[in-house]
């Protein structure tokens, strides 16, 4: 009996072992640190370094999960800071933030938007933002629409560029760095009129379909339903 027939027999007799889905959580929102309000519900950036969106996504490796900290410019979709770590400590988030801050013009006032995870609410992280003239914005609940651009960038990286599983974090780190370079300098976006992030990053003014304010539209639609 071949493999396919064998598995078909197991399936018919309900003897296949159901694959267990392992959920990996990257947001630790139960903490005592201050939670900041959402400042970007109806905000549309018109140039780079006006709004950054931050998020964490897990990267599977054979040894253990690694965690990719990302900071993306919402105007250009360019990833301006990233760090791959084998933990979700505040210090790992700060590594990504420092890379982004190194690119920020000294006189720019940036809104840094994230979820309410401990990595972003911690005193060390928020102090660093305030020291560099950054305003702090956070999601108000678990709705992914409140950080839609960050979620979209995660999806692009993981479905188009990043491997399904790496041998270890070191291998992952080297490959992901190359993937982000490809994303920034070669990957075209329909939301940027098919331009690349690196090119848009040097522009100013509205972009064609450049940033849909998903949360604002969703909130407005919900309000209309309630009032009708």
What are these regions (language model features)?
Residues 45-80, 86-88:
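An active-site-proximal beta-strand-loop segment
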Residues 6, 10, 40, 55, ...:
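Mobile genetic element proteins and their domesticated derivatives, centered on retroelements
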Residues 78-82, 136-139, 163-164:
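Short small-residue beta-strand/loop micro-motif enriched in glycine and branched aliphatics
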Residues 31, 83, 112-113, 189:
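Histidine-centered active-site/metal-ligand motif
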Residues 1-48, 198-205:
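Basic, flexible linker segments flanking DNA-binding modules
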Residues 26-29, 114-116, 122-123, 136-158, ...:
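RNase H-like two-metal-ion nuclease catalytic core shared by retroviral integrases
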């Amino acid at each position: 009996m071949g493999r396919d027939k064998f598995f078909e027999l197991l399936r018919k007799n309900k003897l296949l072992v159901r694959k267990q889905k392992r959920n990996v959580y990257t947001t630790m929102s139960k903490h005592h640190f201050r939670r900041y309000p959402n400042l970007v519900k109806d905000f549309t950036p018109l140039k780079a370094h006006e709004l950054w969106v931050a998020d964490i996504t897990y990267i599977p490796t054979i040894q253990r999960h690694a965690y990719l900290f990302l900071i993306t410019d919402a105007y250009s979709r360019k990833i301006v800071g990233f760090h791959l770590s084998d933990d979700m400590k505040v210090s790992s988030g700060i590594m990504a933030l420092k890379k982004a801050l190194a690119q920020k013009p000294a006189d720019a006032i940036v809104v840094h938007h994230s979820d309410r995870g401990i990595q972003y609410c911690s005193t060390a992280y928020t102090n660093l933002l305030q020291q560099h003239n950054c305003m702090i914005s956070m999601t108000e609940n678990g709705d992914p629409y409140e950080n839609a651009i960050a979620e979209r960038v995660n999806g692009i990286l993981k479905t188009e560029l990043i491997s399904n599983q790496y041998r270890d974090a070191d291998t992952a780190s080297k490959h992901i760095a190359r993937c982000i370079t490809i994303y920034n300098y070669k990957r075209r976006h329909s939301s940027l009129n098919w331009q690349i992030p690196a090119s848009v990053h040097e522009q100013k003014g509205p972009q064609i379909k450049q940033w849909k304010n998903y949360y604002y539209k969703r909130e407005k639609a919900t309000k209309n339903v309630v009032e009708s």
